[in-house]
């Protein structure tokens, strides 16, 4: 009864003329929208913002102005640092490439004859860290898509390296070229996805010897963003560097000054760097391209069961890889990658988006800042479908990497099933969440006009703000309009068939693919790219055994 009286009082307080005025504004704005935009707005459904050119997008070059969180005191941080150096000095790493061991020995590392074992004096590691650039720019073929790495910059890359792909209509299936291209097109369609991050799904219908040629040329033609090359043999790196150079239409000398390509270097935990990864560091760092050294340390499996122990091992492995980039070329751009989580101790299955993962992400950020090296993290979850688990594990991951000072976020959109599957619907859910993060990071406007004193003065006690000039001038852009949230009341939502987030995401990804526009590409560059790919295919591509 009391609630009903309050509702009546609220309704009586509204000045209907002002409400009508606001509705008229809505009708006028809807008259200029496309039918699809009007349909998204109807019934209280909030939807995507109008498409804008990259130059006008608010989602490029995100800056994280929040103070980073910490889980380690200064003493604890120093203890982790010293323990990591002790591992490198006393236990060492297995370096499974003779050329890499020779380079390390020449730089001052201790190589045990007849073995792969290399030990690093702590002074050597610290000397190598001193030449790592704290920030740099990755250059896209469209300069508006350049991304700033390091400092307070926050860059999102889409899902990468999934062997399977899924959508609600077709279900889970092996990766293929058609789905690869669709996911790449989706990455191009959203400005909050700043780079592609490798193959969003592995197209196994393309032979492995030439797969990189088809995929990398697609990344040049279907997007105008920075992209990734896999370190799976020296020649793949060289082909990737040349394709990136052709895509930008620049000489190699400029390419070496302006990094345009990145590679993920995963250690083979515990304490091992394999041949293809080391070759990748040599080829990429020697040519000034970006290396992202990322140990994959699951506590209780490939690392100690304690998160502190796993982070110590992560740090030791990362420092060894980072130091090697500087042995190859002083000042080579590199990132500190952290990917420590835990396993389900009942099954051994990896777990993501957990409290332990969050602690490891924030601790990794503290270490990266200690060394003044840009920090790579990931948006993770272990859910097998688009459900509450997928959302809350990703939300915790995003919270940790944002609060932990992450600079470069792999698997930002589309990661499902612990990385085994790229999901079209999860991609849309993640994009929505990434845009929310971006909006949260937008500085709060506290200008005199934003403080709204004149609006409060005009309305006074007991009034409302629906029809004030202050509201009418801002209502379209005052708040973030989610892609997927359904804000209709229960009755209207029921009449519409009770659609779920899964339903909306399925619809939206199809709409975005239908609206995809290929970015312009100079015909001369296209011809040079096609000629290079054709020549390399004729030469047989690359060997498929390592």
For each predicted feature, which ranges?
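Catalytic-core signal marking the mid-to-C-terminal active-site face
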Residues: 2-4, 21-22, 30, 36, ...
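Long, compositionally biased, glycine/small-hydrophobic-enriched stretches that function as flexible linkers
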Residues: 2-58, 111-113, 117-119, 136-140, ...
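N-terminal small/glycine-rich loop or linker at the start of catalytic domains
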Residues: 56-63, 74-85, 148-169, 199, ...
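N-terminal alpha-helical transmembrane segments of multi-pass membrane transport
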Residues: 57-132
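Short acidic (Asp/Glu) and glycine-rich catalytic loops that position anionic groups and cofactors
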Residues: 59-64, 105-112, 298-299, 341-344, ...
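Catalytic alpha/beta active-site cores
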Residues: 89, 101, 110, 116-295, ...
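Glycine-rich anion/phosphate-binding loop at the beta-strand->alpha-helix junction
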Residues: 264-433
